């Protein structure tokens, strides 16, 4: 996955992640394009194994938007996550801190879940 707005000393609990693992490995709030463990993607967007996926991520204040392969997958206001370990829909998540209280700035990180993964052509533009 792509960690963002994260603390490198505590990436899993100290920031956010958009999942980019193989489409067949996970489902729901862990599938390609999800805000990991917090929000499933709006549409299925992952390509089959062996094909490159693209991602665009935009974060401004409490707004987080993401596209995978040109399809809008996340468009949310993180201030809606007001309780630790709980999503706005009432389902549980792994976060010990309410997501609205996580940093609005931080580091990027690239992660894998035990299988080979490749990244290329990474571009970062400052917001404005």
What are the residue ranges of the model-derived segments?
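Carbohydrate-interacting regions of secretory-pathway proteins
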Residues: 1-128
